[in-house]
Amino acid sequence: MAKTYSAGVKEYRETYWMPNYTPKDTDILACFKITPQAGVPREEAAAAVAAESSTGTWTTVWTDLLTDLDYYKGRAYAIEDVPGDDTCFYAFIAYPIDLFEEGSVVNVFTSLVGNVFGFKAVRALRLEDVRFPIAYVMTCNGPPHGIQVERDIMNKYGRPMLGCTIKPKLGLSAKNYGRAVYECLRGGLDFTKDDENVNSQPFMRWRQRFDFVMDAIDKAERETGERKGHYLNVTAPTPEEMYKRAEYAKEIGAPIIMHDYITGGFCANTGLAQWCRDNGVLLHIHRAMHAVLDRNPHHGIHFRVLTKILRLSGGDHLHTGTVVGKLEGDRASTLGWIDLLRESYIKEDRSRGLFFDQDWGSMPGAFAVASGGIHVWHMPALVTIFGDDSVLQFGGGTLGHPWGNAAGACANRVALEACVEARNQGVAIEKEGKDVLTKAAASSPELKIAMETWKEIKFEFDTVDKLDIAHK
């Protein structure tokens, strides 16, 4: 029988709540944490989110008859309690893949975290996880190069890489900035880095910074015989300016550039990743602004989702937190999104906050970057937590060394190599780390001084965004 139009307002659950639906392999699946308004039933709130993030609007419209609404609509198919919190619940929603433009994380986010987050039917809403089917993953280019290609480019194997963010982050002249880069690379680091807010300010224009940094890299490479790099931040006011800076970095021989993927935008990031792939340049990604989106446990976007989006959009490195440093990061959750960044197939694991299986197919992984308030005493834990496919970045933990930048870099290199050697010999370095470092410091005065300088420095603040109680 032909469908007929009936004007008016219906409850969302009449159309979008489908508890008997079995998700398809090609569906994009989302888990939302919903805090409904008082008096709104869970099924109605879940259906409202499914509607507003897919095909629905506040009233029936006659143009629904011009399409197959039953095919295109999002479907709220399951509800679960949030352990330890009866003010909210988990809603699982399935979206047909045809709702989204191929290869466009911009389009995915416009639907999943668009107008629905201002919806009056809910008091708070958080996107906890997304399952991207392999059919969608294959439409995205992902990391420009990936872990193995980067190791081959940099000729570094069998250990984490070492980095350092140049400090003070703002105010240095280009010449003094280049001097700091040289000292750190000459001292033993693999990479140095622009801070996320270093772009092209009056005290240091981008072109002068790029030139002095490349002079520093070339000199450090000649003296050490090792490949070196510096993350030249090409984030800019416009895409045109961003590509202009990227082209110049390539022209002068820079092996790696950098982008602030959230503040710079997903469209810009996807385009830059494609440029890096085409031009043989590595891409470091900073997550500036992520905590605005992911730190509130009831509203926003969980960082595991931002990790997945970055892997689809493209980047060879991503800052992931440190667990042990100054920045937010629960250990189990952090290990979960590190796997999402690096591994090919990740199983659902609620103990690590992973709500879905995720298959990346042959898409390469990216390096996890640990950065923020770390020093040599953290090295055993960092090597244990992050493993070899990571970049451990010590900013103040390098530049704050009493003997200067080169000594700070040397201390970190000695500590890293001691921990990797001990680990390879079967030592439980996270437990025996003090002994490992003390032994190494006996033949490294730089490490000994670093250990004395930072032995009392800890960041023992409770994590705000924890895993829900019963998931641990």
From Swiss-Prot:
This protein's UniProt keywords: Calvin cycle, Carbon dioxide fixation, Lyase, Magnesium, Metal-binding, Monooxygenase, Oxidoreductase, Photosynthesis
GO biological process per UniProt: reductive pentose-phosphate cycle
Coiled coil: none
Cofactor note: Binds 1 Mg(2+) ion per subunit.
Residues annotated as signal peptide: none
Binding site for substrate: 115, 165, 169, 287, 319, 371
RNA-binding in keyword set: no
Active site (UniProt): 167, 286
Residues flagged as site, Transition state stabilizer: 326
Protein name per Swiss-Prot or TrEMBL: Ribulose bisphosphate carboxylase large chain 1
Lineage, uppermost ranks: Bacteria, Pseudomonadati, Pseudomonadota, Gammaproteobacteria, Chromatiales
